[in-house]
């Protein structure tokens, strides 16, 4: 749901492993190795997000429109609004047990049924608001640039005359997984938390769900050994931050 750092039992996908099957005649000698990161325009990020989201949708089991999950998400979507910084959004539910949700730069917002089973509507609103924050604040774009800065993708970009339009379906799927599973810095997570809080207030939604979602996740973290989440703020601390903001704003 990541509220990304908070996901349980998440594995980090290998990025664009399909690149290793490309014809290497003359390609590996390209100037791709010189890139430190792949520079992408907003339009390129959107195009790649369109392609990656479409590929992920094709592999997922999507809740039917008449399902309780889809009906709940429609209610939540109506409360949150239909755009991120002017970018139209579309919402779908993936039928999977993962406690997860993500948003991409093209407005692709996906929520896993496992998260909806665990959270109330207000908590799901808060989680989605957090994910929208990662998009609105440019964190997702930076994550894509990092993903495309790997050696394999630099080779693909250089050999194919540009990354957009050159990736196979498997590569796009792996890119999508990399974006969904990306970890953000403590600062980025805190910024997305505050974005969600502010968005909820602006939309007339109680921000309490943001605090209680963290509190639920804090219980899941109890007794956890050292893990990939150690670089991120603890859920209990993030919940307290939201409680402090609510208190300062006179919200019970």
Swiss-Prot record:
InterPro entries: Mito/Outer_Membr_Metalloprot, Peptidase_M48. Binds 1 zinc ion per subunit. Residues 1-18 form the signal peptide. Coiled coil: none annotated. The active site is at 131. Its EC number is 3.4.24.-. One of its GO terms (biological process) is cellular response to UV. A lipid is attached at residue 19 (N-palmitoyl cysteine). GO terms for molecular function: metal ion binding; metalloendopeptidase activity; metallopeptidase activity. Zn(2+) binds at residues 130, 134, 189. It is a lipid-anchor. Keywords: Cell outer membrane, Disulfide bond, Hydrolase, Lipoprotein, Membrane, Metal-binding, Metalloprotease, Palmitate, Protease, Signal, Stress response, Zinc. Its cofactor is Zn(2+). GO terms for cellular component: cell outer membrane; membrane. The intramolecular disulfide bond improves the stability and the activity of LoiP. It forms even in the absence of the oxido-reductase DsbA. Residues 224-252 are annotated as: Disordered. Induction: Induced by heat shock and low osmolarity. It is found in: Cell outer membrane. Disulfide bonds join 53-108. Interacts with Era and BepA. Metalloprotease that cleaves substrates preferentially between Phe-Phe residues. Plays a role in response to some stress conditions. Seems to regulate the expression of speB. Belongs to the peptidase M48B family. This is Metalloprotease LoiP. It comes from Escherichia coli (strain K12). The gene is loiP.
